[in-house]
């Protein structure tokens, strides 16, 4: 089940919200949340509910042990147990096939490939439960004594299958005591609607164009860049839209999740881009891998490449994701060692062009899982053995020029700034604009969803 589906919006969500708000106390609310979340998760593949509950139980027990034996050997054993079991499951389901396939290729062996199916959302909820046990071990959060409360945290459907990665410490107090105000609920509806509009109106439309162009067997320079630019819009509006919907749903239920995107396409450097893109993942690797390895103080270059190798692998068990991670590792290494503060002295437009050129090129590594197809695209993009443009590329651009313009504007703070300025000038506008925008936005999304067949969330596969 996906947020941008009629069954979710018309049946699942209304039933959950009614049952949740009719619940008289926190125990009932958590129970409703757990039942709804497990049903939501089981909609995709029921068997993986068992793994989800088992993972939650393992780290609930490990958390209790760490609390009991804090700063003693027992706590260390529990932390190691958490790391081994969680990362072991992740490695088995996500990476075993990739490593066996490459061992067979390079060593000419014939080890059977288990071909495990990837449990939905395992990369996200694994990091969430690890954040709990690691923070418990560091003394940065308090133990959750109720398994019901902990399972509610791990299985919470708004962010279960595609993030953002919500650390336990972020919602710990709300698991034990929360209240949904009218303002919270209204903000949640507004935020959910904004995310839905991003997904249905912009991501799906951009994705359809990107697939049509990039999957063509005859790429020109113009069509290569047009296709990957449309994919650049698709992945941003798809993932940031999902994050907006998750944040909105969380607010409707009384939870305050952190922001996951801060207009990354206005960044003036790659470093700034990663402060704005998928914030929950980049800060996770910063706090739980980069800083423990020594951060900027010891072996900074080594630490950068380790983190970005892991970041690439987190996104997928494929060479293109490894190269994508190392691609950013190299760029960040160059910025930290060679550019340092020089980028601040360069005119902003040049910095924007520099940043977006490499970001867009990076998405090619993300899009093409087949390395031969990737190499074909790179040659086409830089004019090796292909024409500059053809009539199909020109026609596709002209047909979708309006979409490109809307995507460019929507990926900046401009619409928000304009709306806030109008709200300051007119109290009447401020009072009626948001309800009207929500109603119109949801109405348009409903109409589009009825007729659309292209509706994937890209980050579901991670």
Listing of model-derived features with the role each one plays in the protein:
Residues 1-461:
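Membrane-embedded transmembrane alpha-helical bundles that form the catalytic cores
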């Amino acid at each position: 089940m996906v947020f941008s589906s009629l069954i979710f919006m018309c049946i699942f969500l209304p039933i959950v919200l009614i049952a949740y708000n009719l619940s008289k106390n926190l125990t009932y609310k958590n129970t409703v949340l757990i039942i709804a979340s497990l049903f939501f998760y089981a909609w995709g593949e029921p068997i993986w509910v068992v793994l989800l509950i088992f993972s939650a139980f393992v780290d609930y027990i490990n958390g209790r042990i760490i609390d009991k034996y804090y700063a003693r050997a027992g706590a260390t054993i529990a932390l190691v147990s958490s790391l081994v079991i969680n990362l072991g499951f992740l490695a088995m389901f996500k990476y075993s096939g990739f490593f066996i396939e490459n061992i067979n290729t390079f060593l000419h062996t014939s080890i059977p490939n288990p071909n495990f199916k990837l449990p939905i959302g395992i990369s996200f909820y694994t990091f969430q439960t690890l954040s709990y046990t690691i923070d418990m071990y560091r003394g940065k959060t308090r133990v959750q004594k109720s398994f019901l409360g902990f399972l509610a945290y791990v299985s919470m459907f708004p962010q279960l299958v595609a993030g953002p990665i919500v650390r336990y410490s972020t919602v710990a107090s709300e698991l034990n005591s929360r209240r949904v105000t009218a303002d919270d609920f209204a903000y949640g509806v507004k935020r959910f609607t904004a995310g839905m509009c991003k997904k249905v109106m912009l991501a799906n439309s951009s994705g359809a164009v990107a697939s049509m162009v990039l999957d063509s067997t005859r790429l020109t320079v113009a069509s290569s860049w047009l296709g990957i630019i449309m994919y650049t819009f698709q992945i941003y509006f798809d993932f940031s839209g999902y994050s907006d919907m998750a944040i909105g749903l969380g607010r409707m239920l009384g939870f305050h999740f952190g922001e996951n995107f801060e207009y990354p396409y206005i960044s003036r450097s790659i470093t700034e881009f990663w402060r704005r893109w998928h914030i929950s993942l980049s800060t996770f690797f910063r706090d739980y891998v980069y800083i423990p390895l020594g951060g900027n103080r010891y072996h900074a270059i080594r630490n950068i490449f380790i983190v970005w190798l892991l970041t690439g692998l987190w996104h997928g068990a494929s060479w293109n994701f490894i190269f994508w991670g190392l691609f950013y590792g190299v760029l960040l290494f160059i910025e930290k060692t060679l550019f340092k503060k020089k980028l601040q002295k360069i005119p902003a437009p040049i910095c924007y062009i520099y940043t977006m050129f490499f970001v867009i090129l990076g998405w090619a590594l993300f899009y093409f899982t087949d390395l031969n197809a990737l190499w074909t695209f790179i040659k086409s993009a830089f004019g090796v053995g292909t024409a500059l443009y053809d009539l199909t590329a020109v026609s596709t651009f002209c047909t979708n020029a309006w979409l490109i313009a809307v995507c460019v504007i929507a990926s900046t703070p401009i619409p928000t700034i304009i709306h806030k300025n109008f709200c300051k000038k007119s109290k009447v506008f401020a009072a009626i604009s948001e309800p009207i925008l929500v109603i119109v936005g949801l109405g348009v999304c409903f109409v589009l969803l009825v007729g659309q067949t292209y509706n994937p969330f890209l980050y579901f596969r991670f």
